[in-house]
């Protein structure tokens, strides 16, 4: 039992020993902490002293760094400023050599470097650089001038004085353009000079102010006009005809070939311009390049117009053809380029005005010709003005497209009032749509044709009443001949489908002519009328018994019947004789013969049936039996 207390004491002693050890360590730690705190205090004091000393040194160091950087920048700037001056001699050698020897790319790069150096020097504004800047300006101007000369030489080398346009037209070949190599070189030169020009001249500059653009127009413009000059002259020369009175036929003038060549040349030139210049340059430069050729076109059209006005009867159709050709040219060029429409309209205007005036002037001229006639054929023969007028209308059908356009601009019936001269016209060119011949276009033209025919017939009718001395019959023959010729020339030509709805205009004149011619026939027929007394028995129907009828007549009545036969014979023979002397168209002779036969034969046959026994077959009073007079009627056809 003694073991328990001993163990407990032993444990207590160990615990006290451990506590003593811990206390000893804690005391050492406390002493160490105090030492560290003392060191920290001393270190803080030392650091403060260091900061007080190092602060000013750090500020000075930073200032020195900034100063050093500034010095480096100044040295770099000076180096850059010295570089152009140092390289000027090298660039000057390239500039003096020119783009041909130095190579275009190398030459352009040299000028660009000089320009950049000049900009840098101008930005520095150092007085020491003024002389160098002046030398750079001189070199740049010299370089630009040589580039312009290079452009000029390249373009002239590729531009012949002229080409033969018919070679390309007849072989259906495209007109030549500049070679791709030259286009590339010309484009490089233009790109640099135009950019430089606009930078120096400011925003107010226009494309045509560019020296390169002026050079291009000055070289290519004469090339265009020289190439087209012969065709322009040919257009004027082909107006001369062996027979001055011959009517103009479509396509016989050179204006169509001239316009075709102009279109091909202009479009090829526009392609050149688009390949070399920037978009804003295309339109103005194209206008400037074509200016000389357009002036020649305007002069040519004025000469053609003067010729047309002097030969309006025969050559008005040329005005219609020119109107259509030039309108097509304008439309094609506008579609491809958007240019020259107003210039072409101004050039075409004199011819188009003449074309408008011609429609009314032709009617007036026909009236004047009829009024000036002093005589007409006394046999009723047709006169040339009828066929000439219809031939004019036939020819107009060949130019129906431009004529329809012109008539639209005048308005239906506008040719009567010379609407073309009322000041409404402007420098406008008709579009291709206006040349589309629809129902309205054909209707207006047919209206013009009917006006022409009506005016012609009215004029001939009035003149015939004054001039023809052979009475109503010859006037009827004259009018009927005219009607038949008009009808025939309509029926046998392209006028037929256009005027099929207006042929009634001729029916009234045919009816009038027939009425005038058959007036004499009616007078002849009066001798075949007898008087039936109502107090006597009505004649039996059917075949009359001439002997029985005559038995019922008094001697006086028989003498009257004999007189009627004799009067009929005389007037009938005279009418037949006159009929055979008249100069009639075949259709007219048949028409009038038929009218005479239908009017007289039934009356004569009736009269003969009733009274032929009046001279008892001796033929003294009754000259014709029914078969004999029928034979006479047949000779009238």
Q: Where in the sequence are the language-model features?
A:
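Long alpha-helical rod scaffolds of large eukaryotic non-enzymatic complex subunits
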Residues: 1-637
């Amino acid at each position: 039992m003694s073991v328990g207390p001993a163990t407990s004491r032993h444990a207590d002693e160990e615990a006290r020993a451990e506590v003593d050890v811990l206390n000893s360590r804690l005391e050492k730690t406390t002493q160490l902490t105090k030492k560290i705190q003392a060191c920290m205090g001393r270190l803080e004091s030392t650091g403060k002293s260091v900061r007080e000393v190092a602060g000013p040194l750090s500020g000075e160091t930073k200032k020195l760094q900034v100063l050093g950087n500034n010095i480096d920048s100044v040295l770099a700037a000076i180096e850059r400023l010295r570089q152009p001056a140092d390289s000027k001699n090298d660039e000057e050698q390239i500039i003096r050599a020119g783009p041909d020897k130095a190579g275009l790319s190398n030459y352009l790069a040299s000028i660009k470097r000089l320009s950049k150096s000049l900009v840098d020097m101008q930005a520095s504004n150092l007085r020491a650089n003024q002389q160098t800047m002046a030398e750079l300006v001189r070199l740049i101007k010299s370089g630009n001038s040589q580039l312009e000369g290079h452009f000029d030489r390249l373009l002239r080398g590729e531009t012949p004085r002229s080409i033969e346009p018919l070679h390309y037209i007849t072989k259906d070949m495209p007109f030549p353009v500049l070679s791709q190599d030259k286009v590339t070189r010309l484009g490089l030169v233009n790109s640099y000079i135009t950019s430089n020009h606009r930078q120096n001249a400011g925003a107010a500059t226009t494309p045509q102010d560019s020296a390169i653009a002026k050079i291009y127009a000055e070289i290519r413009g004469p090339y265009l006009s020289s190439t087209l000059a012969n065709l322009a002259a040919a257009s004027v020369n082909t107006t001369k005809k062996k027979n001055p009175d011959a009517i103009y036929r479509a396509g016989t003038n050179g204006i169509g070939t001239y316009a075709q060549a102009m279109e091909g040349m202009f479009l090829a030139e526009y392609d050149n311009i688009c390949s070399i210049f920037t978009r804003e340059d295309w339109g103005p430069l194209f206008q400037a390049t074509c200016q000389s050729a357009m002036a020649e076109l305007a002069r040519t059209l004025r000469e053609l117009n003067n010729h047309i006005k002097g030969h309006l009867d025969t050559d008005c159709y040329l005005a219609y053809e020119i109107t259509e050709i030039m309108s097509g040219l304008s439309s094609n060029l506008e579609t491809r380029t958007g240019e020259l429409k107003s210039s072409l309209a101004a050039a075409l205007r004199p011819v188009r005005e003449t074309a408008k005036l011609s429609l009314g002037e032709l009617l007036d001229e026909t009236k004047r010709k009829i009024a000036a006639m002093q005589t007409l054929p006394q046999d009723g023969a047709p006169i040339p003005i009828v066929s000439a007028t219809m031939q004019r209308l036939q020819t107009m059908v060949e130019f129906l497209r431009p004529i329809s356009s012109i008539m639209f601009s005048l308005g239906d019936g506008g040719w009567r009032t010379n609407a073309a001269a009322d000041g409404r016209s402007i420098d406008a060119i008709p579009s291709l749509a206006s040349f589309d011949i629809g129902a309205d276009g054909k209707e207006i033209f047919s209206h013009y044709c009917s006006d022409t025919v009506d005016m012609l017939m009215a004029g001939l009718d009035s003149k015939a009443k004054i001039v023809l001395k052979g009475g109503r019959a010859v006037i009827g023959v004259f009018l009927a001949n005219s009607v038949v010729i008009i009808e025939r020339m309509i029926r046998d030509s392209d006028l037929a489908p256009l005027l099929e709805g207006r042929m009634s205009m001729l029916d009234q004149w045919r009816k009038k002519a027939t009425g005038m011619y058959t007036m004499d026939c009616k007078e002849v027929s009066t001798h075949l009328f007898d008087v039936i007394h109502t107090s006597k028995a009505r004649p039996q129907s059917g075949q009359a018994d001439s002997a029985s009828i005559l038995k019922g007549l008094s001697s006086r009545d028989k003498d009257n019947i004999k007189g009627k036969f004799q009067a009929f014979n005389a007037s009938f023979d005279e009418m037949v004789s006159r009929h055979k002397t008249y100069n009639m168209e075949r259709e007219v002779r048949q028409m009038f013969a038929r009218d005479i036969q239908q009017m007289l034969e039934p009356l004569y046959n009736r009269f003969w049936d009733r009274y032929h026994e009046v001279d008892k077959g001796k033929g003294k009073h009754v000259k014709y039996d029914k078969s004999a007079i029928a034979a006479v009627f047949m000779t009238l056809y």
